[in-house]
Amino acid sequence: MLKHISIKGFKSIRELDLDLSPINVLIGANGSGKSNFISFFKFLHWMMRSPGQLQFFVGQSGGANSFLFDGAVFTKKIQSNLQFESTSGQYNYSFELAYAASDTFIFSEEKFGDLLNSSSDHVVPKNSSSIDEYPNIQQLDNSPLNLRTLNLNLTKERISGYRESRLIDLGTSGSQVARNIFLLMQNFASHQFHDTSQTARLKQRCSIYDNQNLKEDAGNLAAFLLQIRVYHPRYYQRIVDTIRQIAPLFADFVLEPMNNTILLQWREIGTDLVFSPHQASDGTLRAMALVTLLLQPPDSLPDVLILDEPELGLHPYAISIIGSLINSVSNRCQVILATQSPLLVDCFEPEEIIVVERNNRESSFKRLVQADLEDWLEEYSLSELWNKNVIGGRP
């Protein structure tokens, strides 16, 4: 679980220090910065995918300038610190990305450590063999770092000036602490099922072998469902039964591979016709993806599940079901979501709500406190307090 996060200089987030709980629901006006917070986890995901992917993602997203608070003229770097707690221990990972030539980023600092152990590791380059090559290395506690694999004793400063995270290499060849942190960093899953256009991957055929995890845009939903049906029939049936609550005419999925590919199809009650994604409403497709995501077998769940406006296109009753599923899945994985739905907000406790507001161009994040609202909650729901601007989060 991600226990704490600090961010500086990322989009509208000039400076943020935030403790996180099993459920974290961001509410606020349009443009307040909710989606910027959510997009930070997508940024981290690309940063940890494989060498070259961070710069590819930055380039596709408009360049490094577009990620910096008020642009590179005002902000020169992005800084972040993440603190994790898991069954393997408590860990810390931090990095600093500096604006560089050609509208790109370079790492000016990157470090990690075990919070329960006084000795700390530091990210170092793969295949480094000379202190002259990498003159800036130190531990979190500023003590000398003994690089046993390199047989070097270094007392210099931090390593800097590289374009991709060194944690990618150390996640497979470094210390156990490095491996654990890399796995935690890789296990953020950000999902947004907004694209239901004619060219959306959700509506196309996909490989039957692309079934390990549900894709960010549910582009492999059919293959993922087929894998659950074959290996986890009990969970598959729960998915089908829940979709029937949202779409009463839904009977079952028709998951028939053809040439090692598969298309999302289903039948309805009272007919033998087979329906395809192009015949369904946007809300129905999103409901299928959300229910599958939230009811998948626990072993395939990510450590941190991130959702951006999951209520989009859903009937009010469907929103309440999704809220219940989020509460249930939070017992097995951490959930971070942004929403504009009063109905969804009412599915959660006050301490799970984070109000996001924009003041002087920067986003602020404030978690609600139950004790401060006890008198109000005797007469009003959370959504009513939101609409009345008692808790903030309105334009």
Identify the role of each PLM range.
Residues 89-241:
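Electropositive, glycine-dotted interaction segments
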Residues 1-14:
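N-terminal pre-Walker A segment at the start of P-loop NTPase domains
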Residues 212-277:
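Extended helical coiled-coil dimerization/tether regions that scaffold
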Residues 320-395:
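C-terminal lobe/lid and adjacent interdomain/linker elements of RecA-like ASCE P-loop ATPase modules
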Residues 39-106:
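Conserved P-loop NTP-binding catalytic core
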Residues 261-263, 268-271, 277-307, 317-320, ...:
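GG-anchored amphipathic helix commonly corresponding to the ABC/SMC/Rad50 NBD signature/C-loop
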Residues 21-61, 110, 217, 287-293, ...:
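Phosphate-binding glycine-rich loops of NTP-binding sites
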